[in-house]
Amino acid sequence: MSLIPMVVEQTGRGERAYDIFSRLLKDRIIFLGGAVDDQVANLIIAQMLFLESEDPEKEIFLYINSPGGVVTAGMAIYDTMQYVRCPVSTLCVGQAASMGAVLLAAGGEGKRFALPHARIMIHQPWGGFQGQATDINIHAQEILRLRETLNGVLASHTGQTLEKIATDTERDFFMGSEEAKKYGIVDDIVKRKV
């Protein structure tokens, strides 16, 4: 069981209690704080769509501390980030690994940040499947297709060549925030909120 802190606000009509994530959402902050799966993706997508309906011009802030997760769920978040009219700013707090790194890189131009001690990791998608040889082959082809898609997404957001991305993602490729900035995954490193 996870404990989610509550925040109490005083208003003219009395007190109002929010869970901390709902309170952050009022400030247009969405927090990805774990593995990416379908449930997490659906919640993040719903929050983005809600914030867009509230004000399509106002920035959305996606804070990321994630080890990555399911590629299709992550791509649903990615596609929504590109779909909404709101500019989306990304900030890595802790780690952005695998699909988390793809989402970090997908923030708006000039709006991708990392904290000083953040860790970023990119790699190729992995998966396991058992069954008949033909089914295993079908799934292997799908993983290769996903790898090409993810490499293309990273190349388009970082400015790196597809060849460099393919080479670097052959194995786990870890970066600190400075290295991620040089690589083009983030635009800047922030030490203090302004």
UniProtKB/Swiss-Prot annotation:
Catalytic activity: Hydrolysis of proteins to small peptides in the presence of ATP and magnesium. alpha-casein is the usual test substrate. In the absence of ATP, only oligopeptides shorter than five residues are hydrolyzed (such as succinyl-Leu-Tyr-|-NHMec, and Leu-Tyr-Leu-|-Tyr-Trp, in which cleavage of the -Tyr-|-Leu- and -Tyr-|-Trp bonds also occurs)
Keyword Lipid biosynthesis: no
Molecular functions (GO terms): ATP-dependent peptidase activity; ATPase binding; serine-type endopeptidase activity
Enzyme class: hydrolase
EC number in record: 3.4.21.92
Compartment annotation: Cytoplasm
GO biological process: protein quality control for misfolded or incompletely synthesized proteins
PROSITE patterns: CLP_PROTEASE_HIS, CLP_PROTEASE_SER
Its biological purpose: Cleaves peptides in various proteins in a process that requires ATP hydrolysis. Has a chymotrypsin-like activity. Plays a major role in the degradation of misfolded proteins.
Name of the protein in its database record: ATP-dependent Clp protease proteolytic subunit
Organism: Syntrophotalea carbinolica (strain DSM 2380 / NBRC 103641 / GraBd1) (Pelobacter carbinolicus)
